[in-house]
């Protein structure tokens, strides 16, 4: 009785979770891809040692891997890889500890948002993609 609300809904909930977790990244990755020069400029502003490579990695992770996770393709390993990517973007892109307000507050929120997303990705890595996926098992 205590789980009746989601009884028999595991697979559809996992599909919804994959879409909701990744839609932000797929859209951001598309923006980075279609505005690649601007993405390289942003990576340069962050101090990335090889900004063009960093921009390409961001596009591949956000757009390509994001779509693969929505489709449920190699879900468990890609969810773990994506969690590491999100941790890296949190540490590099939102170093709130070295800022002052109001920039500090805004970046702390983004940093914590990234940690929350990592939690969802870890849950996905443990649970797997569900039946509505390209993975076989």
PLM feature spans:
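Extended, low-polarity transmembrane helix blocks
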Residues: 1-34, 44, 52-60, 64-137
């Amino acid at each position: 009785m205590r789980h009746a609300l989601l009884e028999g809904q595991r697979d559809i909930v996992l599909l919804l979770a994959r879409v909701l977790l990744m839609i932000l990244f797929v859209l951001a990755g598309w923006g980075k891809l279609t505005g690649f020069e601007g993405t390289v400029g942003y990576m340069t502003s962050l101090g990335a040692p090889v900004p063009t490579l960093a921009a390409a990695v961001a596009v591949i992770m956000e757009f390509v891997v994001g779509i693969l996770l929505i489709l449920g393709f190699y879900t468990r390993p890609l969810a773990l890889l994506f969690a590491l990517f999100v941790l890296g973007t949190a540490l590099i892109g939102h170093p709130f500890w070295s800022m002052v307000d109001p920039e500090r507050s805004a970046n702390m929120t983004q940093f914590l948002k990234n940690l929350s997303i990592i939690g969802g990705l870890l849950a996905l890595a443990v649970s797997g993609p569900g039946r509505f996926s390209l993975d076989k098992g």
